Amino acid sequence: HNWQVEANMEILRGWTMTAAFRYTDVKQTSFNTTANEWQLRDKPLQNKFKGIITTSYQTPLKTWQFDLTAQFNGEGRMPDGFVVPEGSSQYTSHNGYIYHKWYPQLLGQITKFFRTWSIYLGAENMTNFRQDNPIVGERLEAKDERYVNPQSANFDASMIWAPIHG
């Protein structure tokens, strides 16, 4: 189930604002080996909600445009067997399941319009939010601890739910 609400408003001539909110309730049936039964639960790595607020200003001659977007990404359930990285505060637990917490992002763009083309300068993830240890596995001790051994039995690069670059 999904639902979305959006509102647009012109504050002043050339200055607009948009706010949107999306709620997602996606379930899946899976077998719980601990309880020895089938259960209906949240689909893994699916954000429960996303909110966006965008403000945009275009100059009177329409030669420049400035955009700023704040984005709020909701929590989502992690797959079964996921182990919270040591020292991480980016996760919480509900009803025995691990969820990643919500996180904000800020994006900006400046656009210069010419007669038949345009050029822009943009920035993403200006809040510098990054997922802790996005690649799961044993760390290589011989090298920098940031490196994960791709040959380790628990290596998993599919648990990405947030930006990994600032």
What do the PLM-derived regions correspond to, one by one?
Residues 7-8, 110-114:
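Alpha-helix C-terminal capping segments
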Residues 2-4, 34-43, 92-97, 107, ...:
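Extracellular loop and loop/strand-boundary signature of outer-membrane beta-barrel proteins
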Residues 69, 80, 84-85, 91-98, ...:
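Extracytoplasmic gating/loop element in the C-terminal half of outer-membrane beta-barrel translocons
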